[in-house]
Amino acid sequence: VLDFSYLADSRGNKPSLSIHDRDIKFLEPAFLDLEQKTGIYIDPYGTTRIYPAHQQILVDYLQGRSEDKIVEFVRLLKNAIREDEVLVADGD
């Protein structure tokens, strides 16, 4: 499972999203694109901070996809960008 949450969310009140291993495969190409453009890789088994500029790269790559989890992920990214929030990706 790869959990995405707001870095500043100490109370668990802000939006978050869990993506199971079977759905991560849909995001891997976007993660690789982000790595090629920035050197930042979202490791499904580690912890990564995703800053708003990096979030926008992911949105640009994933925009228009119709898989449910991708749509949810893009929605979370757009909210975080609008609120200028850093996301934390925490994998296991």
PLM features per residue range, with description:
Residues 1-92:
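Acidic (Asp/Glu-rich) sequence patches and key acidic residues
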